[in-house]
Amino acid sequence: VTTETAQKESLGKALGRIASGVFLVSFTKDGKKDGMLSTFVMQGGFDAPVVVVAVNNKRPLLDVLKPGDTFVVNVMSKANMDVYKSFAKPFQEGMDRYEGIALKGGTEHPVLANGVSYMTCKVLSYAPATDHQLLIAEAIDGEQLTEEEPMIHLRKNGFGY
């Protein structure tokens, strides 16, 4: 094992210990509900409240959500494992990832009925971050829906999901 390899392994383990939540970033475009799982979400400001989502450069979401568009960040708990399993599967054409998942009515974008909370966000901008883009958005609405504890995600290796 080379010194460089050992350093990368050590750094990977350290990065993997950065605890994060598990989130469903959801949106509706041209009448079609879509979304993606994310563990790279954080609050980035207070006044106005800012939410930052790191999005892999290969994700189609980057072609869909433009400045001014809105989307939802759903905070998930262990009670949302059905959602996790549905969105963790590879996408197949015609697939409805929301099939069988309870959604809150009266919202523009999919909101998990039994999620911990949700925030409706408006895209402000993107900033490059090597293999990801930082989606910077203002939280414009939101609600706590349950008293469940948010799901916590730790990784064995910080160089992968």
Where would I find each of the regions flagged by the language model?
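Basic, polyanion-binding surface patches
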Residues: 1-161
